[in-house]
């Protein structure tokens, strides 16, 4: 008779593997997420590098629009300053600009969003599909959200940057909270001016700022 009380053994590395899979899925934007996932884990089991299709190859294989900062700016303008947006409404906006449904679903899954979505969090994860690294992701988010419309360096309120960096680092799971806190404290005390704004160069060109 088969034993039913045998404890299930969950490998300690599983949570990290699942996070890496979720991030890879956002970046790859596969047309068939299930098949892509099967190929991904099969490659891992053989000790091989998981499959990642180039963005140009993806665009050639489908009629979806390519995700760009410009399209994210359009979505941001349509959200019109709201902090919370309903998933159904955002899905419709996403569809109107012809972005891949699988990418929308991947962002929803990684962010664990339900019926009501915190727009800045969704935007940050969507930008991570373009940014790859945390620094590049935050650069793109700043460009999308920039309150400078006179052709200057993209800039956003430091409070917004603080929220986004903390969230992205938390989702990434590979950066300790103490490092995030240390970087934010340095930027706030040594970099931010009286206007309370942070520019892209403040965290991409400053050798003392390392967000990764």
From Swiss-Prot:
One molecular function GO term is: signaling receptor complex adaptor activity
Q: Which InterPro entries match?
A: ROP_DD
Per the similarity annotation, which family is this? Belongs to the ropporin family.
Q: Cellular component per GO?
A: cytoplasm; motile cilium
Domain of life from the UniProt record: Eukaryota
Q: How does it assemble?
A: Homodimer. Interacts with RHPN1. May interact with SPA17. Interacts with AKAP3. Interacts with FSCB; the interaction increases upon spermatozoa capacitation conditions.
Residues modified as Phosphoserine are: 56
Keywords recorded for this protein, A-Z: Cell projection, Cilium, Flagellum, Phosphoprotein, Ubl conjugation
> Where is the region Interaction with RHPN1?
209-212
Supply the source organism for this entry: Homo sapiens (Human)
What is the documented function of this protein? Important for male fertility. With ROPN1L, involved in fibrous sheath integrity and sperm motility, plays a role in PKA-dependent signaling processes required for spermatozoa capacitation.
Q: What is this protein called?
A: Ropporin-1B
């Amino acid at each position: 008779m088969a034993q039913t009380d045998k404890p299930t053994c969950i490998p300690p590395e599983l949570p990290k593997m699942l996070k890496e899979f979720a991030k890879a899925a956002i970046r790859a934007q596969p047309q068939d997420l299930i098949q892509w996932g099967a190929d991904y884990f099969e490659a891992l089991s053989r000790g091989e590098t998981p499959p990642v299709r180039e963005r140009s190859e993806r665009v050639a294989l489908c009629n979806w629009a390519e995700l760009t900062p410009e399209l994210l700016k359009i979505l941001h303008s349509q959200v019109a300053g709201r902090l919370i947006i309903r998933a159904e409404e955002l899905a419709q906006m996403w569809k109107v600009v012809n972005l891949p449904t699988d990418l929308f679903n991947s962002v929803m899954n990684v962010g664990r969003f339900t019926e009501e979505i915190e727009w800045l969090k969704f935007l940050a994860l969507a930008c991570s599909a373009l940014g790859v690294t945390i620094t590049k992701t935050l650069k793109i988010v700043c460009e999308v959200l920039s309150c400078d419309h006179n052709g200057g360096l993209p800039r956003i309120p430091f409070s917004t940057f603080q929220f986004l960096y903390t969230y992205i680092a938390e989702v990434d799971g590979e950066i300790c909270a103490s490092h995030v806190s240390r970087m934010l404290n340095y930027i706030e005390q040594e970099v931010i001016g009286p206007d309370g704004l942070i520019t892209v160069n403040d965290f991409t060109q400053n050798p003392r700022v390392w967000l990764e």
